[in-house]
């Protein structure tokens, strides 16, 4: 699959250290190499969304939108578990999903 990153995702990824940075790079490689989203480990579809998913990376959550036409994963957010389901993030994700 193809992979794209938002500025917010890149900024959060650069702040990671140690095992989280390694885990994130492994997860991104997994995303690039799987044939479809259903094959990803630690990945779940977000309730109430059509093409938005989250991947668990330790105590962090990576949220992405899967664009079926281009077979592209657009990583939008990388946040700690405590912030992950904040209404602001989910509202913004919903807007981006709709285009």
Residue locations for each model-derived region?
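Active-site micro-motifs of SAM-dependent methyltransferase domains
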Residues: 11, 30, 80-83
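Arg/Lys-rich, positively charged N-terminal/basic patches that mediate binding to nucleic acids
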Residues: 1-27
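Enriched for short, Lys/Arg-rich terminal
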Residues: 57-60, 65-99
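A short, surface-exposed loop/turn module that caps and links secondary-structure elements
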Residues: 29-54
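Short, flexible helix/strand-to-coil boundary loops that buttress conserved ligand/catalytic motifs
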Residues: 16-17, 35, 88-89
